[in-house]
């Protein structure tokens, strides 16, 4: 070895030692950061606490009834949760407004949006009911202003309506005028130094549950495909977690608070299975169920409806990476007895009540039984469905109507007398029928009626039982093939078999008349006429008139117009 090579050798040794020393001081892995998210879905403008049933082993029948929800309670819950984490993110999964009780609906749902703004909602996926009054009216509710197709309701609660105060998201709702999404597809919220991406979507089949007018200028694309397309873009922005917020749902027989429930079924399951693995959690809505289920490795949640539950999620997020090491979820019951009311929300609720009661408390009529519920028997018939169909048949009598049909999804509550009162009031009746759909009369042939009834059973397994009016009846068999479950020859009107080639005059609401809920046979009706009366007005008139005649209507039990043989 030459004297020139020795210094080089010593230098190399020194560098190696330094490198080894450096290994001893490698930075430890970054600790996960807890990001808290609180979600509600399907609030539907319920400003007040309202009836909810929960499983309770201590109750005589295993079910406890209470009043849950209401903006005062929801606000109180958020106040308490924010004491633990002031940076929690409050979000929605659609149908926050629309299909609302009159306390909110008579003011174009502006009090509900005002409440959510005060509660600092960060974002929401759009639901189908946000589109009840069409694209332009939804955009007004989003952005503010008073130019509305509901001039007697918009800007009546406040002279100036500033907008929702939070963005709606939809990756799959396309404005046909531009070919682009009507709304931002996603939003990134930065909390505790972490980037959390929320991607919104509405159910692909939204056109089947929104009126044709409501969907004008809009179309939808597949939920999962629309979300998956955005994953590379989100990753380029360095997000630490991706949350899908989809207004589509499912159901399970398991309790709303069961961890990692495993029996979830319905449309949301297919969406969940097809989502990119980069999606960390799926917050759902639409089906009005509470669950915390797993679909494969993906957690899928929903918080019932009407403000009854709040879904709380804690994501353990790894700084500097898109990596979630843990997710904990709970569905919290919005029990007014457990959470002190938020003073600001309580004041808003009382203001709305005080300004609405002169209309809402107006007596309508007596009923022959209380409650009259929308709970279906095994055949799919409900006591309240019977009553509403009878009211619509009475409204169509002058137009020759022989049969009325009512969709169960349009019946939004039960009818029950308040303690000490003998008559229902306007607010109670309007809560049950909030959509103000015009009634339409038209003709279908007898053979078309049977085809129509067979459309109640959907390919995915749902049974959307139409409610039928007095004098109309049929029988069905669950063991018969899809598309032919109505027993041939069992469809009768006033005790006589319906004749295949004879025309029969029907009356239905405008939503059904346009083929809503995928009842396409209604669109084949001929000799159409607009009754120029709404479903709500027909029910109010029927209740009032029968009460005045001393013949109050309604029953606690279904009338047996629909019979399931097996």
Each PLM stretch: what is its role?
Residues 324-424, 447:
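Hard-cation-handling environments
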Residues 2-11:
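Bacterial N-terminal signal peptides that target proteins for export
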Residues 44-62, 364-375, 433-435, 517-525:
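Acidic/histidine-rich, surface-exposed loop or edge segments in extracytoplasmic proteins
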Residues 19-22:
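C-terminal motif of bacterial Sec signal peptides marking the signal peptidase cleavage site
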Residues 3, 26-33, 356, 360:
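Extreme N-terminus of proteins, especially the signal/transit-peptide cleavage junction
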Residues 24-338, 379, 383-394, 404, ...:
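Acidic, metal/ion-coordinating pockets
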Residues 33-36, 46, 156-186, 294-298, ...:
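Feature captures C-terminal
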């Amino acid at each position: 070895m030459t004297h020139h090579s020795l210094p080089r050798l010593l230098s190399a040794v020194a560098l190696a030692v330094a490198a080894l020393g450096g290994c001893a001081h490698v930075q430890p892995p970054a600790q996960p950061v807890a990001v808290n998210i609180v979600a509600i879905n399907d609030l539907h403008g319920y400003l007040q606490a309202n009836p909810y049933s929960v499983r309770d082993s201590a109750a005589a029948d295993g079910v406890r009834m209470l009043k849950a929800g209401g903006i005062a309670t929801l606000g109180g819950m958020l106040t308490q949760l924010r004491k633990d984490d002031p940076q929690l993110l409050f979000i929605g999964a659609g149908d926050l407004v629309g299909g609302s009780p009159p306390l909110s609906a008579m003011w174009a749902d502006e009090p509900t949006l005002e409440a959510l703004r005060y509660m600092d909602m960060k974002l929401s996926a759009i639901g189908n009911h946000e589109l009840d009054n069409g694209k332009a009216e939804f955009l007004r509710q989003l952005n503010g202003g008073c130019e509305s197709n509901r001039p007697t309701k918009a800007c009546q609660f406040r002279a100036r309506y500033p907008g929702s105060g939070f963005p709606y998201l939809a990756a799959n709702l396309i404005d046909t005028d531009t070919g682009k999404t009507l709304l931002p597809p996603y939003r990134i919220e930065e909390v505790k130094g972490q980037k959390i991406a929320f991607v919104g979507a509405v159910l692909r089949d939204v056109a089947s549950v929104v009126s044709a007018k409501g969907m004008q200028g809009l179309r939808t694309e597949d939920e999962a495909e629309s979300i998956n397309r955005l994953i590379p873009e989100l990753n380029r922005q360095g997000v630490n977690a991706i949350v899908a917020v989809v207004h589509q749902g499912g159901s399970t027989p398991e309790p709303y608070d069961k961890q990692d429930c495993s029996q979830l079924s319905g449309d949301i399951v297919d969406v969940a299975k097809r989502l990119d693995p980069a999606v960390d959690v799926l917050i759902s809505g639409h089906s009005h169920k509470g669950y915390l289920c797993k679909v494969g490795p993906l957690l899928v949640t929903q918080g019932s409806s009407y403000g009854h539950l709040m879904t709380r999620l804690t994501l353990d997020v790894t700084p500097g990476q898109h990596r979630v090491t843990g997710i904990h979820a709970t569905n919290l019951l919005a029990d007014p007895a457990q959470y002190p009311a938020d003073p600001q929300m309580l004041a808003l609720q009382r203001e709305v009540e005080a300004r609405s009661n002169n209309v809402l408390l107006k007596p309508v009529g007596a009923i022959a039984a209380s409650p009259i519920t929308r709970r279906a028997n095994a055949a799919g018939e409900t006591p309240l469905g019977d009553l509403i169909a009878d009211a619509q048949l009475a409204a169509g009598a002058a137009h020759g109507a022989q049969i009325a049909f009512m969709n169960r999804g349009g019946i939004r509550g039960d009818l029950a007398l308040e303690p000490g009162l003998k008559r229902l009031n306007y607010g109670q009746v309007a809560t049950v029928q909030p959509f103000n759909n015009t009634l339409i009369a038209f003709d279908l042939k007898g053979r078309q009626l049977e085809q129509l009834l067979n459309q109640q059973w959907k390919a995915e397994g749902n049974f959307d039982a139409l409610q039928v009016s007095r004098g109309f009846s049929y029988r069905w068999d669950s063991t018969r093939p899809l598309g032919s479950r109505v027993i041939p020859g069992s469809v009768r009107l006033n005790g006589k078999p319906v004749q295949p080639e004879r025309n029969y005059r029907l009356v239905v609401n405008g939503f059904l008349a346009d083929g809503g809920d995928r009842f396409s046979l209604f669109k084949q009706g001929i000799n159409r006429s607009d009754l120029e009366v709404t479903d709500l007005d027909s029910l109010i008139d029927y209740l009032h008139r029968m009460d005045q005649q001393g013949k109050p209507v309604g029953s606690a039990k279904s009338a047996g117009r629909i019979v399931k043989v097996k």
